[in-house]
């Protein structure tokens, strides 16, 4: 029971100090994650376009 109280107290202290520090490292990580998401989105859009073209070719050949 006391361990939980100490753990909560440490979490609150950490949250207070973490909120006051510069978010430089967190911002860098966020930008990297955002860039990965953008690349994934772009690759998905390109793949869908290629698949649609392939389906059109197949439909044209089928008659």
Swiss-Prot record:
Positions of modified residues (Lysine amide): 62
Keyword Cytoplasm: no
Domain of life: Eukaryota
Subcellular location: Secreted
Main location: secreted
Keyword field: Amidation, Antibiotic, Antimicrobial, Immunity, Innate immunity, Secreted, Signal
PROSITE patterns: CECROPIN
Cellular component per GO, a single term: extracellular space
Keyword flag Secreted: yes
Homology family: Belongs to the cecropin family.
Protein name: Cecropin-2
Gene symbol of the encoding locus: CEC2
